[in-house]
Curated annotation (Swiss-Prot):
GO terms (BP aspect): apoptotic signaling pathway; cellular response to mechanical stimulus; DNA damage response, signal transduction by p53 class mediator; positive regulation of apoptotic signaling pathway
Name the record gives this protein: Death domain-containing protein CRADD
Keywords of the record: Apoptosis, Cytoplasm, Nucleus
Subcellular location per the Swiss-Prot or TrEMBL entry: Cytoplasm; Nucleus
Origin species: Pongo abelii (Sumatran orangutan)
Amino acid sequence: MEARDKQVLRLLRLELGAEVLVEGLVLQYLYQEGILTENHVQEINAQTTGLRKTMLLLDILPSRGPKAFDTFLDSLQEFPWVREKLKKAREEAMTDLPAGDRLTGIPSHILNSSPSDRQINQLAQRLGPEWEPVVLSLGLSQTDIYRCKANHPHNVQSQVVEAFIRWRQRFGKQATFQSLHNGLRAVEVDPSLLLHMLE
């Protein structure tokens, strides 16, 4: 999920909690679309109040990949006023992006291109243990991470390279420098790492 969308959920957290969004079809829709796992749904339903259920859902959503926010909007069919409020807050966040959210000095054709194997290798050299939350925010799963670790048990850099190559294969044209930049910011890793990849 993009940093901007996470910020919107954070800002509207209490308002969303007051709406008790989990009482309708929201959870089922998010489960059906693959945003929530069966365990997530059980964990949310185990909460004792509607407010707690909604708060837990809001805690889980940011780590559920790039489509989580839009799918969450789609799930709010029964709450059109909430959906409009979220869309409006998102538009305001877009027009109000701080300078750090833009990659200065990088041409748009590069931002919209996918990183090469060599560039992924450079990123892997610079990323520390935070590589796991980064690839999760880009839409990979814990299972993907487990497989990368199992394939390269003694070489962390190879684990990281394989994870980013999986991301590039899975998301195709959407696996761009721009989405990588958003993923780094989402987990508060310095996005200037990308500039080193482009040197």
